[in-house]
Regions:
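Blade-edge motifs of beta-propeller repeat domains
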Residues: 20-38, 77-104, 145-179, 214-240, ...
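Beta-propeller blade termini
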Residues: 41-49, 106-115, 182-190, 233-235, ...
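Blade-level signature of beta-propeller repeat domains, shared across WD40, Kelch, NHL, RCC1
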Residues: 407-454
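Acidic/hydrophobic-patterned starts of short beta strands in beta-sheet-rich repeat architectures
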Residues: 51-61, 117-127, 192-201, 248-256, ...
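C-terminal outer-membrane/trafficking sorting elements
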Residues: 459-470, 474-549
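Beta-strand-rich domains and repeat architectures in extracellular enzymes and scaffolds
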Residues: 33-66, 71
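Loop/turn-rich, solvent-exposed surfaces of beta-rich toroidal or solenoidal domains
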Residues: 340-387
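Short glycine/acidic-enriched loop and turn motifs that connect beta-strands
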Residues: 62-68, 128-134, 203-207, 261, ...
Length: 549
C-alpha cells in the first residue's frame, strides 16, 4: 500500500463510508478574532521570504455579514519561531490606515509574486470593492513589497503613524461605481514578455475578465508606477458569457469559468484572442481549477470541480487542451450521499503530501455530508492513461463534522498546500471563508507524516508516541498517555476548537524515558471537542478528545 495510506487514520461514520483522514497537526486561531469575525478571506503559506528559517503564513480577513468590524480589510503575516508551539503575528496592515473610506466585500484574492522582477517578493491583495459615495472607485489591487533582508515587514511605513501602507495600489476601473469583484487570481506571463501579469476572474458585471501588468512596484511607494489593463471582455464587440468564478492558466492561454461558457483568452504572439466553449454541466467552478502536468509528459492539464448553477452533478473533471477547446473526462462524481450529498465543491490547491512524486489535488466543500466540511484529495497513481478514472485515487483528507462546523455551516474554500516543516512531504492548510454565528473558524494544518510538525532533522526517527486519551468521550477527567523512547523536554497542552490554549499540563519539563500518564480535569470547561498536543524537544504530535457534560 502507498506510503500515504499507511499514515492515514481510517475512521468509520454512520453511513458506513471509510474516511481516510489525514491527522490534524495544528490548529491556528484567527488573529484579532473579535475584529476578524467574518471568516478568513484567503491565505498563502510555505514561504520564508525574510530568510530566518521560519515558515510563514499570509492571510487576509473576509466580510460575510457586513458587520462594522469585518468590512475593514486587514492583512497578516504569521510565523512560528523555531522551538515555539504557536504561530505569532509578526506584521500586519489595515487598509483603512491608508484609505480611511475603503470597506470590503466578500472573497478577496491573495498571492505572493515579484511583479516588477526586482528580487523583492510582494503580497498582492485583491480587496473586493464596496463602492459608495465616499469611495466610488476604490483601490482593488494592493501590493505590499518586502522591505528586504531579514525584515518581517512589507510595504512603506508611514513616518507619522508608524502604520504599514502599500507600495502600489490600482483601481482597475477608470470610472466610478463599477462593480468589479475578482474572486480567483493567477500570476503568470501570458504574453511572454518576461514579466508576470495578474489574471483575474471577476464575479460581477463591471468587468469579468482581467489581464493586467505593472511596470514597477516602487520601493518608496511614490506611485510612479504605471498599471496597464492588457485585456478585458470590455474590448469585445459582444460577450457571450456571464460573471466569472475561476481561472486556470495553461502556457499562453487563460480559461475563465462560469455557468454560461468557459471563456478562453490566448496570446497569439501579437494580440489577445477570445473564444468560448460550453460550460461544465454542473455549472461554475468556484476558485478551484488547478493546472499542472499531471503525468510528466510535458502537457499541462486542468483539474476542476463543479459548484452550482447547472445540473445536480458534482464531478471532479480532467480538462485537456485540444485546439480551441478542452477535452473533458469526469473522474469522480461527488454528488452522492456518501460525499457531498447535494453540497458543492469549492476551493482548491495542489502539492505532494505523501512525497511519492505524484501531485495531490485538494478540493474543499460547502454543505457537504453529513459529515460537514469534507476536504477531498485526488491523485493520479503514476501510471496508465490519465483519462481512465481507475488510475486515480479519491480519499477524504479531513471532515470537520460537528466539532468545527455544526450542521452545514462554513464555506471551506480557503486552501493551500505547502511544506510547513522540514520533512519532504507537503501539508494541507484549510479554513472557512465565512463564520459560524459571528465566530471565524481557525486554520487547520493536516500533516500525513504521522502527526509530526516542525521536525528539523527528517533523518532522525520519532522517539515518542502519543496515545488516545481515555476514556473518550469523558466527563470531567481523562488520561493522556505517552511513551518516550529517550528522555527529552516535554510540553503537553490542551486547545479548544478555536485553537486557544485552555490548559498546559506539562511545561518544558525534562522527562525521563518510559510510559507516562497525565490526568486532565476539564471540570471548568464547556462540553465540546478539544485537542491535546505533545511537544518533545522540537517534534510535535496531536490528538483529539470529546468532553460530554
Amino acid at each position: 500500500m502507498k506510503n500515504l495510506l499507511r499514515l492515514l487514520l481510517v475512521l468509520s461514520i454512520g453511513t458506513g463510508l471509510a474516511l481516510a483522514v489525514i491527522p490534524r497537526a495544528s490548529i491556528i486561531p484567527v488573529p484579532e478574532d473579535s475584529l476578524n469575525n467574518g471568516g478568513i478571506g484567503n491565505l498563502v503559506a510555505g514561504y520564508d521570504i525574510d530568510g530566518d528559517g521560519n515558515i510563514e503564513i499570509y492571510m487576509v480577513n473576509d466580510n460575510w455579514a457586513d458587520s462594522p468590524t469585518e468590512i475593514v480589510p486587514r492583512i497578516y503575516k504569521l510565523e512560528r519561531p523555531y522551538g515555539e508551539e504557536e504561530f505569532q503575528v509578526v506584521w500586519s496592515a489595515n487598509a483603512q490606515d491608508f484609505t480611511p473610506d475603503i470597506i470590503q466585500n466578500t472573497w478577496p484574492t491573495l498571492a505572493v509574486a515579484d511583479l516588477d522582477g526586482d528580487g523583492k517578493m510582494e503580497l498582492i491583495w485583491g480587496i473586493v470593492n464596496w463602492t459608495n459615495a465616499s469611495s466610488p472607485n476604490p483601490y482593488r489591487i494592493w501590493v505590499y513589497e518586502h522591505e528586504g533582508g531579514d525584515s518581517d515587514n512589507f510595504g512603506v511605513q508611514n513616518p507619522v503613524t508608524g502604520k504599514w501602507e502599500p507600495n502600489s495600489v490600482w483601481t482597475i476601473a477608470d470610472a466610478d461605481n463599477q462593480n468589479i469583484r475578482p474572486i480567483s487570481m493567477k500570476v503568470a506571463d501570458l504574453n511572454g514578455d518576461g514579466k508576470d501579469q495578474l489574471i483575474l476572474a471577476s464575479r460581477a458585471s463591471g468587468m469579468r475578465i482581467i489581464i493586467a501588468s505593472v511596470d514597477d512596484i516602487p520601493d518608496d511607494g511614490d506611485f510612479s508606477e504605471t498599471w496597464t489593463l492588457d485585456f478585458s471582455e470590455k474590448e469585445l464587440p459582444s460577450y457571450d458569457a456571464d460573471n466569472k468564478w475561476d481561472v486556470a492558466v495553461i502556457e499562453n492561454s487563460a480559461y475563465f469559468f462560469c455557468e454560461a461558457k468557459i471563456s478562453k483568452v490566448s496570446w497569439n504572439g501579437s494580440e489577445y484572442v477570445y473564444s468560448s466553449m460550453d460550460p461544465l454541466p454542473g455549472g461554475i467552478t468556484f476558485d478551484c481549477a488547478q493546472a499542472a502536468d499531471i503525468n510528466g509528459d510535458g502537457n499541462i492539464e486542468i483539474l476542476a470541480g463543479e459548484y452550482l448553477y447547472g445540473d445536480a452533478t458534482r464531478n471532479i473533471w480532467l480538462l485537456q487542451e485540444s485546439g480551441d477547446t478542452l477535452i473533458r473526462t469526469p473522474l469522480f462524481d461527488l454528488s452522492v450521499e456518501e460525499y457531498l450529498n447535494g453540497g458543492r465543491i469549492c476551493g482548491g490547491a495542489q502539492g505532494d503530501i505523501d512525497n511519492d512524486g505524484n501531485i495531490d489535488f485538494i478540493f474543499g466543500s460547502r454543505f457537504s455530508g453529513p459529515p460537514n466540511a469534507m476536504m477531498f484529495r485526488v491523485e493520479y497513481q503514476g501510471s496508465g492513461d490519465i483519462t481512465d478514472p481507475a488510475n486515480w485515487e479519491l480519499t477524504i483528507a479531513d471532515t470537520s463534522s460537528e466539532e468545527f462546523a455544526p450542521g452545514t455551516s462554513g464555506f471551506w474554500n480557503v486552501i493551500d498546500v505547502a511544506n510547513m516543516d522540514d520533512d519532504p512531504e507537503d501539508e494541507i492548510l484549510y479554513t472557512s471563508s465565512i463564520p459560524n454565528a459571528g465566530v471565524s473558524f481557525p486554520i487547520v494544518i493536516l500533516d500525513s507524516n504521522d502527526y509530526t510538525v516542525g521536525v528539523r532533522n527528517v533523518l532522525t526517527p520519532l522517539s515518542f508516541e502519543l496515545g488516545q486519551a481515555y476514556p473518550n468521550p469523558f466527563n470531567p477527567t481523562t488520561v493522556i498517555p505517552f511513551t518516550l523512547e529517550k528522555a527529552g523536554t516535554v510540553t503537553l497542552s490542551v486547545f479548544n476548537i478555536k485553537g486557544q490554549n485552555v490548559a498546559t499540563l506539562i511545561s518544558r519539563e525534562y522527562t525521563e524515558a518510559g510510559k507516562h500518564n497525565v490526568m486532565f480535569d476539564a471540570g471548568n470547561l464547556a462540553s465540546g471537542v478539544y485537542f491535546y498536543q505533545l511537544k518533545v524537544d522540537n517534534t510535535m504530535r496531536a490528538g483529539k478528545m470529546t468532553l460530554n457534560k
